[in-house]
Amino acid sequence: MNIRNARPEDLMNMQHCNLLCLPENYQMKYYFYHGLSWPQLSYIAEDEDGKIVGYVLAKMEEDPDDVPHGHITSLAVKRSHRRLGLAQKLMDQASRAMIENFSAKYVSLHVRKSNRAALHLYSNTLNFQVSEVEPKYYADGEDAYAMKRDLAQMADELRRQLVLKKSRYVVLGSEENQEAQDSTLPDAEEACQPENPAGKGSEACQPENPAGKGSEACQPENPAGKDTGSHSTDVQDSSEYLDSTS
């Protein structure tokens, strides 16, 4: 299962999912209104074949007299894919996007008083609180619970994760700089080799015998000029069960 941001080409399948799951339905222009105005806020759940099995349609409320806050317009998951935690993941993704993109302080929604499964998810899992009852909110005359979820705790957690992420980058960058610096420095043996300005001996083969005795590992260069023949040395890697709209 995959949760991702909804794209324009997903809107028709989102509407189809809505028609299968909910009594509250919307014309396609309403989906486009959300998708064009707040493209960051709506998400879909798709199965292994790329088919949409759930969605959340969300927006920001345009109330100049209130703090920035989002609203869940519609949430649905097909019956064949319920109790997999998809509704909770969709809601959390939308809420997180509201914080990151619009600094939302809370998110609101409406739910039918008779929708016990949705009420259980919102109240017990997602920490929504009932703010008021709106009489005859739905077209069939049923009342709705208006609910709100404070996003301060989620915002704090997102800030904490961001700080940790930045600190990891700083530490990683420091380690890479140190490795780069170390790679440019000579090792201890190279740093201690004399440059032999007098021209004596060979840097590749310094004699270990200061007393002047011969060594098989390092033959002298025959300064006396005697013919000794040729001499060479070879050196040998991711639970829900609901429908909800407002």
UniProtKB/Swiss-Prot annotation:
Region (Interaction with NAA15), start-end ranges: 1-58
Organism annotation: Rattus norvegicus
Coiled coil (residue ranges): none
Family label: Belongs to the acetyltransferase family. ARD1 subfamily.
Region (Disordered): 175-246
One Pfam family in the UniProt entry: Acetyltransf_1
Record-level Gene Ontology MF annotations: protein N-terminal-serine acetyltransferase activity; protein-N-terminal amino-acid acetyltransferase activity; protein-N-terminal-alanine acetyltransferase activity; protein-N-terminal-glutamate acetyltransferase activity
Superkingdom in the source lineage: Eukaryota
PROSITE patterns on file: GNAT
Top EC class for this record: transferase
This protein's record includes keyword Cytoplasm: yes
Purpose: Displays alpha (N-terminal) acetyltransferase activity. Proposed alternative catalytic subunit of the N-terminal acetyltransferase A (NatA) complex.
The protein's Enzyme Commission number: 2.3.1.255
Segment forming the signal sequence: none
Protein known as: N-alpha-acetyltransferase 11
Catalytic activity, reaction form: N-terminal glycyl-[protein] + acetyl-CoA = N-terminal N(alpha)-acetylglycyl-[protein] + CoA + H(+); N-terminal L-alanyl-[protein] + acetyl-CoA = N-terminal N(alpha)-acetyl-L-alanyl-[protein] + CoA + H(+); N-terminal L-seryl-[protein] + acetyl-CoA = N-terminal N(alpha)-acetyl-L-seryl-[protein] + CoA + H(+); N-terminal L-valyl-[protein] + acetyl-CoA = N-terminal N(alpha)-acetyl-L-valyl-[protein] + CoA + H(+)
Record domain N-acetyltransferase: where: 1-152
Higher taxonomy: Eukaryota, Metazoa, Chordata, Craniata, Vertebrata
Subunit architecture: Component of the N-terminal acetyltransferase A (NatA) complex composed of NAA11 and NAA15. Interacts with HIF1A.
Record localization: Cytoplasm; Nucleus
Bias type Polar residues, positions: 230-246
GO cellular component, one term: NatA complex
Gene for this chain: Naa11
Keywords, alphabetical: Acyltransferase, Cytoplasm, Nucleus, Transferase
Keyword Transferase on entry: yes
